């Protein structure tokens, strides 16, 4: 009898092993499954952090460097020779990564994406691949280590942003790009090996031709080191088949797990995962990613409306802050994130774990749904009533979460919501509908 039990156990283990081998993303790279994407789809809000030596001057990270290949953005203010020496003055002694992560969590964020290397090539960890890194600043300490440890401590999912562009590396876009491939693959290996669990790899644009990049080798390594990691859609955003066509099946995984509209709210889209990345600092030149004291800080109300517009469109919001050169977050950003967090604590249940719809969002606001519940998020409007698209189903009950009592009438032309002006929320009036099953 015991022998039969052991045989059965052995067969179960063999079957499990075969299943794992069949689903080994390193052996056969593939996009993330729906199950692997679920935490991200439920999270809705992440914190993006752009930082580096550019903060010493309060200029746009990378783009302020005069002499980069794209001098048409209007950011260019610092000669390359001066920009490339800013790291010698980068000494953020007041950095408290634990405080940053507490701030993110209290704001309602479920994940954080931190800049490890931007287009200027400077590395915020002690990489072995170049001397242009944090070790050779007055600060010297591994900032990525501090971010990773604090994120893990506070239960935030960890993401690394990595720019595959590198305007200061001598081998970037040279010849067949093989030396640069070796360089950046080795850096990705460091980032996915030395910091515990990494949940997101957020690439940002590489240029050239398909044949110049070993994408299959890269993604096999990524999935070998972090089997359930999510990867955005920018690993090959500006790689064009001018000389070589992508090999069969390559686009299936290189196109990534989700889209990334930038400085704009994505369109309503329930069939493809997407995440809008937007800055808390608004600048006239369209930047504001890194510390920009010349910019305007979006207040909590504006950030909430951006979040609601994103989530009702079935997307996530990656909201960006740019720390000061001291290592501190700007006080007004901290204040507005705390206010946003207070709102999320009260109303986040209408966003977290939901999907956008069942009707498209618009200037009026939008809707989220989960089970038999639909939450209407209504931005301020004129008049007594608001006519929305028709709902696919019959409303069983209505509850106004932000005060007052709305009435909802279903007609052949749509859904009419009526609520007196004094009962409307200044930012987002939320009406909960229970639908008949």
Regions found by a protein language model. Give the residues of each.
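Positively charged n-region of N-terminal signal peptides that target proteins for export
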Residues: 1-6, 104
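Bacterial N-terminal signal peptides
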Residues: 6-17
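Mature catalytic domains of secreted/periplasmic carbohydrate-active enzymes
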Residues: 22-437
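A detector of low-complexity, intrinsically disordered, Ser/Thr/Gly/Pro/Ala-rich segments
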Residues: 2, 9-10, 427
């Amino acid at each position: 009898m015991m022998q039969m039990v052991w045989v059965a156990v052995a067969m179960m283990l063999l079957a499990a092993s075969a299943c794992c081998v069949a689903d080994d993303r390193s052996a056969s790279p593939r996009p993330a499954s729906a199950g692997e994407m679920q935490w991200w789809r439920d999270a809705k809000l992440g914190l993006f952090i752009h930082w580096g030596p550019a903060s010493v001057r309060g200029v746009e990270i990378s783009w302020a460097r005069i002499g980069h290949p794209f001098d048409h953005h209007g950011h260019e203010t610092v000669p390359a020779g001066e920009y490339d020496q800013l790291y010698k003055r980068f000494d953020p002694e007041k950095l408290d990564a634990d405080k940053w992560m507490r701030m993110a969590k209290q704001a309602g964020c479920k994940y954080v994406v931190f800049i490890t290397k931007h287009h200027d090539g400077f590395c915020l960890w002690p990489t072995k691949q170049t001397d242009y890194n944090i070790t050779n600043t007055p600060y010297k300490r591994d900032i990525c280590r501090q971010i990773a440890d604090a994120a893990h401590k506070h239960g935030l999912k960890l993401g690394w942003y990595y720019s595959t562009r590198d305007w200061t590396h001598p081998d970037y876009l040279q010849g067949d790009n093989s030396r640069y491939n070796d360089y950046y693959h080795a850096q990705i290996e460091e980032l996915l090996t030395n910091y515990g669990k990494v949940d997101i790899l957020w690439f940002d644009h590489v240029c050239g031709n398909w044949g110049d990049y070993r994408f299959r080798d890269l993604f096999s390594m990524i999935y070998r080191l972090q089997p359930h990691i999510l990867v955005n859609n920018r690993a090959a955003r500006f790689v064009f088949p001018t000389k070589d066509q992508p090999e069969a099946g390559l686009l299936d995984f290189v196109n990534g797990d989700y889209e990334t509209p930038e400085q704009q709210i994505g369109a309503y889209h329930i069939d493809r995962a997407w995440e809008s990345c937007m800055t808390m600092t608004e600048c006239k030149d369209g930047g504001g990613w890194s510390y920009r004291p010349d910019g305007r800080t979006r207040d909590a109300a504006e950030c909430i409306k951006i979040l609601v517009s994103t989530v009702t469109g079935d997307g996530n919001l990656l909201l960006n802050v740019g720390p000061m050169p001291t290592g501190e977050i700007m006080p007004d950003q901290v204040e507005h994130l705390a206010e946003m967090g207070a709102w999320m604590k009260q109303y986040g249940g209408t966003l977290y774990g939901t999907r956008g719809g069942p009707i498209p969002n618009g200037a009026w606001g939008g809707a989220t749904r989960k089970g038999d519940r639909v939450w209407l998020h209504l931005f301020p409007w004129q008049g007594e009533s608001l006519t929305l698209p028709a709902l696919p189903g019959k409303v069983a009950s209505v509850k106004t979460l932000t005060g007052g009592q709305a009435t909802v009438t279903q007609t052949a032309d749509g859904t009419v919501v009526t609520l007196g002006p004094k009962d409307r929320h200044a930012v987002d009036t939320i009406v909960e509908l229970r639908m008949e099953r």
